[in-house]
Amino acid sequence: MDSKEVLAQQSKLFRENLPGVTENFSDLCGTVFKDGKLSLKEKELIALAIAITVKCEGCIVHHTTGCVEAGCTMEEISEMMEVCVAMGGGPATVYAGKSLRIAEELLK
């Protein structure tokens, strides 16, 4: 089972058991993740950078997908990861690598 399938299963279980929280969080994300003064692409890169530095695997899957869907290239994602490594040190390299693997799959 790949990372996206695992995340989908976990999200389904969360929605079934916490529908109110899920709905409110979804509304929040719908408000935040759209073009504004920052483009959706920029917001997804920021979210992925945060996901990598806080080591949230599900967030990494979600926002790597978001980056690709928003039009990010592998080069843009990789450059953002340079900042993650500069700010997060060695652990950021592990989680950045996970995101690169996912992005590589999605960009094929």
Predicted regions, residues:
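Acidic, glycine/proline-rich low-complexity segments that act as flexible tails and inter-domain linkers
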Residues: 1-43, 94-108
